[in-house]
Amino acid sequence: MCNAEFKGDCMIKKIPMIIGGAERDTSEHEYRELTLNSYKVSIPIINQDDVEAIKSQSVENNLNINQIVNFLYTVGQKWKSENYSRRLTYIRDLVRFLGYSPEMAKLEANWISMILSSKSALYDIVETELGSRHIVDEWLPQGDCYVKAMPKGKSVHLLAGNVPLSGVTSIIRAILTKNECIIKTSSADPFTAIALASSFIDTDEHHPISRSMSVMYWSHNEDIAIPQQIMNCADVVVSWGGYDAIKWATEHTPVNVDILKFGPKKSIAIVDNPVDITASAIGVAHDICFYDQQACFSTQDIYYIGDNIDAFFDELVEQLNLYMDILPKGDQTFDEKASFSLIEKECQFAKYKVEKGDNQSWLLVKSPLGSFGNQPLARSAYIHHVSDISEITPYIENRITQTVTVTPWESSFKYRDVLASHGAERIVESGMNNIFRVGGAHDGMRPLQRLVKYISHERPYTYSTKDVAVKIEQTRYLEEDKFLVFVP
């Protein structure tokens, strides 16, 4: 669904717009031209006709959870095929336009397949977050009521471009709760949401899930009169990104509409005097290298408790070199390379221990506690020597620190209470920062609960409660002044 045209000597990739599960005719639209990794991308700008189409869009979704999961599984099997054209195009786009290494791009496509194909996990997400996988389909008895979880309606997803899978996750959550999806892509990644929605259409263009997909782009920095109309029709908003993105979502969402905010976070690693230094270093290296530290869960600072920090430092160097081969770093801009070099020189000038990989593939700095320099990301990390957990807690910030990885795993039980009390939102084993386990929270919340509205059907007055074993005849109680007789 993505095509290209030639402008001068340059090939420009054209990104489609999808509304209601159908590619929009944008031949008369204005276009915005983006430059990604020195290549041109052309994206249609939404107009009033598009807004009216979105407003009038209403998909009757009578699917049960089994039908939803089975459809997602079918799509996931397409992504599992290495010959699926949508997958191949997606991988090429990530490499060409986003600067991913081929290995990184392939891994991203593999994860899309994994998420969609993991039927048990999809069921369990609903079960653990909503209390029952049946509550989205049936009225369930709870206490003295029957309760059902209904979709909010139109869910607007304001996606970030740094972590493609966050957008996939956002969309899957809305699908599991039977919401329509209005997806605003990021200028940094206009490919993932389109590829996912298009794969739904490839599978069955008439399916309610396919028809509930709308994918488009607008800029926060231009006239937002038309985008504001889309925001005004939202029943729930899911916002991903940095401070400016979250601020924009807050300012342009109607006051009576809930916003799920997945804003900027930082993450750290704790290495607690491991016996198996190699195993610990492998885990920490993975957590530094995955997404080149662009994700909220990416390790930026390492705190080493124990006496063998130099041995660990040397082993971590070896493992970072390994990741340079098995998961090569993505392309960097000139400014990013300059920032990387500047931090390296500053740390060397400060007499810190500094090691770096070939071609700026990674940077590791051993620095005193509290001597934090700038963080260029791009697989750069600071390691600090501490004596115990009390020296680490001042650097765990409430609402800022997301993931704390711990190695060895057994030490996490020792530290989890103090980490949680100081603001950590996730505690995971080193090497697992990118895998959000089923049943866990995301940024301190259970997102599916925010994507539904619970409707209660309460039992009649003839239904006695645990504390009052008679009919609840309120008029009679008032007439006979016997209310207190029934107080437990």
Curated annotation (Swiss-Prot):
GO terms for molecular function: acyl-CoA dehydrogenase activity; long-chain-fatty-acyl-CoA reductase activity. Keywords: Luminescence, NADP, Oxidoreductase. GO terms for biological process: bioluminescence. It catalyses: a long-chain fatty aldehyde + NADP(+) + CoA = a long-chain fatty acyl-CoA + NADPH + H(+). CDD domains: ALDH_Acyl-CoA-Red_LuxC. SUPFAM superfamilies: ALDH-like. Pathway: Lipid metabolism; fatty acid reduction for biolumincescence. It comes from the Bacteria. Its EC number is 1.2.1.50. It is an enzyme of class 1 (oxidoreductase). LuxC is the fatty acid reductase enzyme responsible for synthesis of the aldehyde substrate for the luminescent reaction catalyzed by luciferase. Belongs to the LuxC family. This is Long-chain acyl-protein thioester reductase. It comes from Photobacterium phosphoreum. The lineage of its organism: Bacteria, Pseudomonadati, Pseudomonadota, Gammaproteobacteria, Vibrionales.
